[in-house]
């Protein structure tokens, strides 16, 4: 298989009107990745393949989304909507380059797996000329039926055209197919539009190929592989299936999910073995959690690295650029953004650390914030090793706190603090004996006077 060339035609020109959205359908996301990018990822999982993207509405945006993850692709605009075969032929220029295999896939089927497409390509390598990907739903009503004679596929019959006997067939058309490259254009050009809608249907190439004595066959894949997305309900269903797959994959790889159904991953989440994830945790894009870490409930992460044996949460938020070293702690109601926290440092409660470096073994007290933004620009806070930042401190960047320095609680620090120094940045306390009693009597009298006038 590795020496066979392949062109994958990704049909992504559908209007998607049932999505009720200004966004092209294929750019809606599952697990933080556009539908069409899931499909391209699966295609690339079969081995080296050139990509021909057939686009319509939002063509530039669709192409940009695909290339962000897949690298350069060829894009072809389908200017008229005249059926699936017509859509494939929009990429005629690419097909004419000549390939061993032609994969035809749909940009709105994000759950298709690489192994399913690989299986279709393997059939081509074994001698098939056309391979249709089929499935067996619990209820086949509404789907085109795959009509077989022995191990050969002879036709695809749509539900409305099927006889009662054919409607009993449970093997249905998944829409995706693989075609031997040398026959692709001849088969596609032979498709006519003699039907009620006057459209050119890709499914017709099955009967055409069979009539020419070609080897046409079908393979069966799991039902979820061919689920197409047409509305927001189906989008949510696809998300649920994807998450279920990912949770299983994570647990089989050595990650403990205490309540799997409450944990949500992104398409690129990387979690190493022996990590424990408590209930109700969300992983956004670009998160890597190293071995032995503990993620407590209600934590939200994106664009973050969590080091070995680190502890996060509960109710912690890690934003892009958070880089937490080994055995660090980011506790409840803490937010870390664009900051490196070195080994053993603790940020336990009610704290914001942004655009900062926290040295090894330092302790950040409750309520501490780095004041990193003046409304126009961001500035950096550097905290040395083994520093102690007292509770309710404000560190006004740019500022540096030296190794082993102490910051008194309640301080506002605007100047650099040398190593081993103790810094205060607050008003001196004054205590007035008996004043509280006088104030209580005064305020009670005011309240009583207001009540009497009502």
From Swiss-Prot:
Domain of life: Bacteria
Active site residues of this protein: 349
Organism annotation: Brucella anthropi (strain ATCC 49188 / DSM 6882 / CCUG 24695 / JCM 21032 / LMG 3331 / NBRC 15819 / NCTC 12168 / Alc 37)
One GO biological process term: cell wall organization
Ranges where the record places region Pyrophosphorylase: 1-232
Molecular function GO terms recorded: glucosamine-1-phosphate N-acetyltransferase activity; magnesium ion binding; UDP-N-acetylglucosamine diphosphorylase activity
Matches recorded under CDD domains: GT2_GlmU_N_bac, LbH_GlmU_C
Location of region: Linker: 233-253
Any one cellular-component term (Gene Ontology): cytoplasm
PANTHER family documented for this protein: BIFUNCTIONAL PROTEIN GLMU, NUCLEOTIDYL TRANSFERASE
Annotated InterPro entries: Bifunctional_GlmU (IPR005882), GlmU-like (IPR050065), GlmU_C_LbH (IPR038009), Hexapep (IPR001451), Hexapep_transf_CS (IPR018357), MobA-like_NTP_Trfase (IPR025877), Nucleotide-diphossugar_trans (IPR029044), Trimer_LpxA-like_sf (IPR011004)
Protein name: Bifunctional protein GlmU
Keywords, sorted A to Z: Acyltransferase, Cell shape, Cell wall biogenesis/degradation, Cytoplasm, Magnesium, Metal-binding, Multifunctional enzyme, Nucleotidyltransferase, Peptidoglycan synthesis, Repeat, Transferase
Compartments in which it is found: Cytoplasm
Subunit structure: Homotrimer.
Gene: glmU
Its EC number(s): 2.7.7.23, 2.3.1.157
Family: In the N-terminal section; belongs to the N-acetylglucosamine-1-phosphate uridyltransferase family. In the C-terminal section; belongs to the transferase hexapeptide repeat family.
Catalytically driven reaction(s): alpha-D-glucosamine 1-phosphate + acetyl-CoA = N-acetyl-alpha-D-glucosamine 1-phosphate + CoA + H(+); N-acetyl-alpha-D-glucosamine 1-phosphate + UTP + H(+) = UDP-N-acetyl-alpha-D-glucosamine + diphosphate
Keyword check for Acyltransferase: yes
N-acetyltransferase as annotated region, ranges: 254-454
Binding site residues for Mg(2+): 108, 230
Pfam families in alphabetical order: Hexapep, NTP_transf_3
């Amino acid at each position: 298989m590795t020496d066979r060339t392949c062109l994958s035609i990704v049909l992504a020109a559908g209007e998607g009107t049932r999505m009720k959205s200004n966004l092209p359908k294929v750019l809606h996301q599952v697990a933080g990745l556009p539908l069409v990018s899931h499909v391209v990822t699966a295609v690339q999982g079969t081995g080296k393949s050139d990509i021909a993207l057939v686009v319509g509405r939002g063509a530039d945006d669709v192409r940009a989304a695909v290339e962000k993850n897949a690298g350069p692709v060829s894009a072809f605009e389908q200017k008229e909507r005249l059926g699936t075969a017509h859509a494939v032929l929009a990429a005629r220029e690419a097909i004419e380059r000549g390939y061993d295999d032609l994969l035809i896939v749909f940009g709105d089927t994000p759950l298709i797996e690489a192994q399913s497409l690989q299986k279709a390509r393997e059939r081509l390598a074994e001698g098939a000329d056309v391979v249709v990907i089929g499935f067996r739903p619990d209820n086949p009503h509404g789907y085109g039926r795959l009509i077989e004679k022995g191990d050969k596929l002879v036709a695809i019959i749509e539900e409305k055209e099927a006889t009662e006997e054919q409607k009993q067939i449970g093997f249905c058309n998944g829409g995706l197919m693989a075609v031997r490259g040398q026959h692709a254009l001849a088969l596609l050009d032979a498709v006519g539009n003699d039907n009620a809608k006057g459209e050119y249907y890709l499914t017709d190439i099955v009967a055409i190929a069979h009539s020419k004595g070609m080897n046409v066959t079908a393979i069966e894949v799991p039902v979820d592989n061919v689920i197409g997305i047409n509305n927001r309900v189906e989008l949510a269903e696809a998300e649920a299936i994807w998450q279920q797959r990912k949770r299983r994959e994570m647990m089989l790889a050595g990650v403990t999910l205490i309540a799997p159904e409450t944990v949500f991953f992104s398409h690129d989440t990387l979690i190493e073995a022996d990590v424990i994830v408590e209930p109700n945790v969300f992983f956004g894009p670009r998160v890597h959690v190293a071995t032995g870490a503990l993620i407590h409930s209600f934590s939200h992460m994106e664009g973050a690295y969590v080091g070995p044996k680190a502890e996060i949460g509960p109710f912690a938020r890690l934003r892009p650029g958070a880089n937490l070293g080994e055995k660090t702690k980011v506790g409840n109601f803490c937010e870390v953004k664009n900051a490196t926290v070195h080994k053993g440092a603790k940020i336990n409660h009610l704290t914001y650390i942004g655009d900062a470096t926290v040295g090894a073994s330092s302790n950040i007290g409750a309520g501490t914030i780095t004041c990193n933004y003046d409304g126009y620009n961001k500035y950096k806070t550097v905290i040395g090793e083994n520093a102690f930042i007292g509770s309710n401190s404000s560190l006004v960047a740019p500022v540096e706190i030296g190794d082993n320095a102490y910051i008194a609680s309640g301080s506002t620090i605007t100047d650099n603090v040398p190593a081993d120094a103790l810094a205060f940045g607050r008003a001196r306390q004054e205590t007035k004996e008996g004043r509280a009693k006088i104030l209580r009597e005064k305020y009670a009298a005011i309240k009583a006077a207001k009540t009497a006038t009502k």
